[in-house]
Design a protein with these regions (language model features):
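Aromatic- and carboxylate-lined catalytic core of secreted/periplasmic carbohydrate-active enzymes
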Residues: 30-31, 357-469
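Noncatalytic carbohydrate-binding groove/subsite architecture in carbohydrate-active enzymes
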Residues: 204-348, 361
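N-terminal substrate-binding region of glycoside hydrolase catalytic domains
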Residues: 28-159, 163, 170-171, 176-200, ...
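C-terminal beta-sandwich/jelly-roll accessory domains of carbohydrate-active enzymes
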Residues: 445-529
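Classical Sec-dependent N-terminal signal peptides that target proteins to the secretory pathway
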Residues: 9-25, 524-529
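Surface-exposed intrinsically disordered loops and tails
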Residues: 33, 118-148, 178-204, 240-260, ...
Length: 529
């Protein structure tokens, strides 16, 4: 071979290596959530609750009815295998239908708790131990779900029965829970130690396997559903999910285990309780204080952290589809104690601001842990077990929870963040205040009061603690607004009125002199011009 030919062949080989490197580096995967996620355009912001257990008169149907009256319009519904196996898989169907009739929609179905016989540790609490037989084939040769893969069989039956009433399937509960906080930072480079994952007791690879089984089975039963992670807390655990496959030894990519964990969920469900601080991993800013703005921001900054990790792995809406985000557990005590932050005013303000910040940060749902407590905890109602009717129960609604009724009144979930109008509005506000403008995305429904196309909200910003007193200033709006306070009281005011701001948000709506019917007439007349 002459020198010229050698040079040509070597150059060709070198270029082939470069091409192969770049081809692998920029490979676009086309499977599962790497390829597509369900359309989320019809998902409006919703407040939900996990209900909890009260007893006596308060079964799930009555609690759901009461929760709807308290301003909730979604729910985190627990459907454990153990419960369905004991009582029959259809046991929750009537309650699921009741939710739909009440307007409790886009419900989260919480998949968890194998039977003892289907747990990896039958002598322990099955709620805290991963399912057995996860690595059995998911499907048989004829395409049906393999009954020897216990989790697959349970998911298939559950999704098939409840798919008309459940929108999002949450996969387990807090698999990343640990008290060995010093080890968490290692999870960005090493697999978590199964021994310290005390709500899972399995490897990260087996949790990815759980996601894969859930995803492949649920999508076959209902291609329109969302599959979510199981209430994650640590961004480092999410990083590990995205870094590894379900290959059981090292989480490597193989022919049998071709995709990493990001392929197997559409929705990032996370948990954040605002008594715990959060650090923004992108900016390094710490969120440790306990004013209501800071408490609300803690909940959404954890979402921002998860989103940052997802973008690192290409889930940015360009390379791969974006995930949606829901917060399936949070809460704040209605009374302060030596071990927990809380109080009537701070909780009231936190609930209102949490809705506004969640819409700002595009969190689709926020779920409170429980509906009721002894009067001091995170519930909305006090000592419901003493009551025997929905009407009587409603009288136990805590003062700090009543702001959600104002949010329900103005249908805040039908609005989205308007960045341009927010920036303009904030320029007109005094120092130490906060403002957000929302614009309507979803249309008015029959029988629904119309409150216009925009919601302007403003309040005194509370970082370290709740700020007392009021700030007086002159409005500078282009319309005469209807002002609604946290109790739902209405007052029509002028666009240049002098108003007072406190730490509790007020809502200014462009609907004080124009009702929906007139609005429709004007649209028709304009179309004829």
């Amino acid at each position: 071979m002459n020198d010229e030919k050698k040079i040509y062949m070597n150059s060709f080989f070198f270029l082939s290596l470069i091409f192969s490197f770049f081809e692998n580096s920029f490979e676009i995967l086309k499977y599962g959530a790497y390829d597509k996620v369900p359309d989320s355009n019809n998902l409006q912001y919703r407040f939900g609750t996990g209900l909890g257990y009260i007893g006596n008169f308060w079964d799930d149907a009555n609690m759901a009815n009461l929760s709807r009256k308290a301003g909730y319009d979604t729910q985190r519904k627990k459907l454990p295998e153990q419960h369905l196996d004991d009582w029959g898989y259809y046991i929750e169907l009537d309650d699921a239908k009741t939710n739909t009739k009440l307007g409790i929609l886009d419900v989260v179905g919480y998949l968890a708790t194998p039977t003892r016989g289907h747990s990896s540790n039958a002598s322990s609490n099955p709620e805290l131990c991963y399912p057995a037989n996860l690595y059995e084939p998911i499907f048989l040769n004829n395409g049906s779900v393999n009954p020897n893969n216990y989790w697959a069989y349970y998911v298939n039956k559950t999704v098939s029965i409840y798919k008309d009433y459940i929108k999002i399937w949450e996969t387990w509960n807090e698999p990343d829970y640990t008290k060995e906080y010093s080890q968490v930072s290692n999870w960005k480079t090493e697999p978590p130690d199964p021994k310290i994952l005390t709500h899972w007791y399995g490897s990260i690879f087996s949790y990815i396997r759980l996601l894969r089984v859930t995803y492949e089975v649920a999508k076959k039963a209902d291609p329109t559903c969302f599959v979510s992670t199981g209430g994650l807390g640590y961004p480092e655990f999410l990083h590990a999910i995205l870094r590894y496959t379900d290959e059981p030894n090292k989480g490597e990519v193989t022919n049998e285990f071709p995709y990493k964990g990001g392929a197997y969920f559409d929705c990032d469900a996370y948990h954040q309780y605002p008594q715990y601080g959060v650090t923004d991993i992108e900016t390094g800013e710490k969120y440790d204080d306990n004013g209501s703005d800071m408490l609300a921001k803690k909940v959404v900054i954890l979402k921002k952290n998860h989103e940052y990790i997802l973008k690192e792995f290409g889930f940015d809406g360009i390379k791969y589809p974006k995930k949606i985000f829901i917060n399936t557990e949070t809460g704040l005590n209605s009374e302060k104690s030596s071990s927990a932050i809380g109080g009537d005013l701070v909780r009231r303000n936190w609930i209102l601001k949490l809705a506004l910040y969640s819409i700002l940060y595009d969190v689709k749902q926020t779920h409170m842990l429980v509906l009721a407590d002894d009067g001091t905890g995170m519930g909305d109602f006090s000592k419901l077990w003493e009551t025997k009717s929905i009407e009587e129960g409603f009288t136990r609604l805590k003062s700090s929870s009543k702001g959600r009724l104002a949010l329900q009144k103005i249908h805040i979930g039908k609005f989205i963040y308007d960045k341009e109008k927010t920036e303009e509005f904030k320029k007109s506000l005094p120092k130490n205040t906060m403002g957000i403008v929302l614009k309507r995305k979803f249309t008015k429904e029959d029988g629904e009061e119309y409150y216009g196309e925009y919601i302007y909200s403003a309040w005194i910003y509370c970082e370290k603690e709740e700020v007392g007193g009021e700030i007086e200033f002159e409005l500078d709006l282009s319309f005469n607004p209807l002002m609604i306070d946290w109790e739902g009281n209405e007052k029509s005011i002028k666009k240049n009125s002098i108003i007072k701001l406190s730490s509790t948000p007020i809502f200014l709506l462009n609907s004080s002199f124009i009702k929906y019917e007139l609005y429709l007439i004007l649209l028709v007349l304009l179309s004829l011009l």
